[in-house]
């Protein structure tokens, strides 16, 4: 009997260690975890401003996704590719970066206030807001008209 409990406890420990770190449990249902942050692709068409507002309403500290490294860029690209619902509006997906802030000054930070540490621009021409382009498998940043509605990815 004692040995059976010991074996059962041992199997439980092995199962828990194989099931991961539990980081996914920190995310809301339907969100994906990556290096301490949670992400979700929304198949809703919104302007950049409306998408940012929507993200801030999802959870405390929510914003359009900020991409701080190539590793995070690859994670977001895969997440978008796997979760975007194909329509004519899926050529672009908003990210949390604007070429100019609301006061028409050049922005040097993401919508969550973090500094721009990683860049992956595809164009130099500015249309004020940035998104990921399907043609680049959602890996390159492209300038877009802020007033056009596209799908988006939130990060908390």
Swiss-Prot record:
Q: Does the keyword Acyltransferase apply?
A: no
Stretches assigned to coiled coil = none
Q: Does the keyword tRNA processing apply?
A: no
Family assignment? Belongs to the snaclec family.
Subcellular location(s) of the protein: Secreted
Q: Which InterPro entries does this entry report, sorted A to Z?
A: C-type_lectin-like (IPR001304), C-type_lectin-like/link_sf (IPR016186), C-type_lectin/snaclec_domain (IPR050111), C-type_lectin_CS (IPR018378), CTDL_fold (IPR016187)
What miscellaneous comment appears in this entry? Shows greater sequence similarity to the alpha than beta subunits compared to other heterodimer snaclecs.
**Residue ranges annotated for the C-type lectin domain, each copy included:** 34-155
Functionally, this protein is described as follows: Interferes with one step of hemostasis (modulation of platelet aggregation, or coagulation cascade, for example).
Kindly indicate where the leader peptide sits in this chain.
1-23
Under the subunit heading, UniProt states: Heterodimer; disulfide-linked.
- Kindly list the cysteine pairs connected by disulfide bridges: 27-38, 55-154, 129-146
| Gene Ontology molecular functions | toxin activity
Q: Which domain of life is it from?
A: Eukaryota
Please provide, in alphabetical order, the Gene Ontology terms of the cellular component aspect for this entry: extracellular region
What protein name does the entry list? Snaclec A5
Keyword field: Disulfide bond, Hemostasis impairing toxin, Secreted, Signal, Toxin
Expression sites by tissue: Expressed by the venom gland.
